[in-house]
Amino acid sequence: MGTRSSPEEGTPPPLVPECDVEVQPQGHPEESREQEASEVLAEPSSRGGAEQQAEEEEVGEGSSTESSRDAPEATPPIAMAATPPASTSSREGVRGAARRLQGQQLEALTRVALMEQRVKELQRQRKELRIEMEVEVALLRGELAGERVAARREEEQLRELLEQQAASEQRGRQQREQEQRRLSQERDRLEGLRQRLRKAQGQLDSQPEDQRERLLQGVQEMREQLDVAQRAYEDLEFQQLERESRQEEEDRDSPGPQVPDPKVQELQASMAQHRRGALQHRIRVLEEQLKSLGEQMAAESRGLSRKKEEALQALSQERSRLLELNCLQGTPGGDFSEPNPALTKLLFTQKTDRQLLVLQDAVAHSAATPTSSCLFSVHSSLQGSIGLQRTGSLPRKRGERGSQRGSPRPLSFHCTESLEASALPPAVGDSGRYPLYQLLNCGRGNSCGAIHPDIAHMERLLQQAMAERERLLKAREGTRRGTEGSSGPAVPAITAPPTPPHPPGPRILDLRQHLEGWGHNPENCPHVQVSGCCCRGPLVKMGGRIKTWRKRWFCFDRQARRLAYYADKEETKLKGVIYFQAIEEVYYDHLRCAFKSPNPRLTFCVKTYERLFYMVAPSPEAMRIWMDVIVTAADENHAP
């Protein structure tokens, strides 16, 4: 990385603007060690020459452990000249202290990760407990409401039964009283006629002969009236007896007597009272269970909240200790002398659902120049990729190829100023590819909030920044060589690794000839339109949130490096885009995982960082063509 300055030289190398932080994929921690050269150049002159030599030797050791992907670009370190024993012992002491600090940092990182996992587990348990308790409470409340409704129904039936009984008794009593009054009236009338007849017969003997005939006629009329009244009384009495007998017969024959037997009615009332008491007892039991369940839920919630608070306090303490260790090992600004991707993730990024918040150390805010935090949004497909690069293999043709990503996934940066060369972190030894994640350096005058959704524009800016960075590295190398030549170098120079080339574009490939070479015949497949760089055709796709199957028109474009799908064949209503960089796997749905697939035998899957797409082809040949087309695009993008 250029010549090394001797410890005796007091002139620091020229400063070059660089990014504050760089987050590298966790799967390749060796790549971050190559940035030591540029970080050493940016350090203040207060650091001694022995520390610079120690860090440069650590850079050499990090470069010798590069992965197989970066092996062609990494240059083996050249043996350094012999140094005095004092410098050697000082360098070994610094190296040992750095190792101890790094070990403590890794231990603290492990504890922090475990505590974060504990906090998440407590949150999950609390959520599950709340859901379970809510379900139990809802069930108990529903059962209690049902029991109360049944109790009210029983009470209403009992009240109606008692009212019917009272009304029936009242009607029977009134009817009997009315019949008794009629019988009494007829009996009194009959008795009056009898008394008149006896009185007339008594007067008949004492009357003279001339009046006796007239009295005999009156007595005869009275006897006739008495006979009529006697017959009427007997008829009325007979009708009453007949009505009573008929009522008794109806009561015996009918299943529901209008006037039930008092014993039966008493039995029914007692049964209703018993059922009512049982329902009330059940209601009391359910109310007690509901109350105890609420108390239990509150107690468990308080316990989980207390455990969560304890875990959060421990997590805060471990993070503070980790920041202190970082300040002991790194610079006052919080940079690491040996960047660790996992530590970088922990200290500088806090992953939310769809955002990465760049955090800054409070010590850096008080000691160094205050800078504003920069926020950039990352699509949810990037979840879990900071510090842990996801790898995948395409089962059809990606067998033994490397799992490194060739180009970055789409990012949406929020910064008002344009991207400068100093705002991008160095990416030496990255084989000419862009870093997977890059944190922008928002200075004091920068403000966050403007959105640049144009991905192609962002890629062009990244290429310009890479070129500017390479130019600055060359200028730095020339300055170092000039300084070494003027001071008479006593040690051999270290040759810089070759400049990484620009990301190569897609190789020239005729898609139609490629498919024909694989044994396909696009001419005989009317459902697919294949040209040299495009492939179009209808597919049935399952929705992401709402699992419904809809027919879409897919357009595979190698020049735009994307697979777009539209609502119409004229390609005017764009519904979604799948970029080549996001494709991980393409495979046949042999497990029949698609939800209610219209044709499971023609269903295949396209796995991306964001989601899993289920698609149904119109024919088997169309399915094979589409799978080979998408696999070819993913192979080109992920080729090592």
UniProtKB/Swiss-Prot annotation:
Residue ranges with Basic and acidic residues bias: 170-189
Annotated region (Disordered), positions in chain: 1-100, 162-189, 241-262, 387-412, 476-504
Keyword match Chaperone: no
InterPro entries named among the record's database cross-references: PH-like_dom_sf (IPR011993), PH-like_domain (IPR052212), PH_domain (IPR001849), PHLDB1/2/3_PH (IPR037810)
Keywords recorded for this protein, A-Z: Coiled coil
Ranges annotated as biased composition (Pro residues): 495-504
Official protein name in the record: Pleckstrin homology-like domain family B member 3
Lineage of origin: Eukaryota, Metazoa, Chordata, Craniata, Vertebrata
